[in-house]
């Protein structure tokens, strides 16, 4: 099946980027990187500094893609990826069992250009305020079916 990317805005509009929709993502910049800022402090009578903490910044992703020239797809991209309206960006890779999402807001609505005679390029930017992907897959663990000695191997009765 491959990779499917779906964007759903907070108003309920959605658009899918996949082989089935004939809207293709060719590159995603910023998908796997995180910007980290370190806080440092000087040490009295010491050499160098010590790390006192770090901040992991929000994630900025740039999506570039193309589609067969179609005014309906063009209009749908503009109708779903709206300025000032947040949403959920889902990334599903069935070949590698990945089903994750980010919540955020577009920082650039789609821009368009010509790719070839019958195809059109597009690009938009999305900022996820929480930089890590979250799983769409629900995991549950039943404590009713678990032997308590597996959880606490220490005898607490003494």
Predicted regions and their residues:
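Extracellular/virion structural assembly segments
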Residues: 1-158
